């Protein structure tokens, strides 16, 4: 259960990072 939460948190951070990067490019 803990590992699942860690994975979800990691994915969420990656998505946020990707969106911020895309915004910077535009």
Curated annotation (Swiss-Prot):
Entry protein name: Putative uncharacterized protein YOR161W-A
Further remark: Completely overlaps PNS1.
Highest taxon of the lineage: Eukaryota
């Amino acid at each position: 259960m803990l590992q699942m939460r860690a994975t979800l948190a990691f994915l969420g951070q990656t998505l946020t990072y990707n969106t911020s990067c895309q915004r910077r490019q535009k």
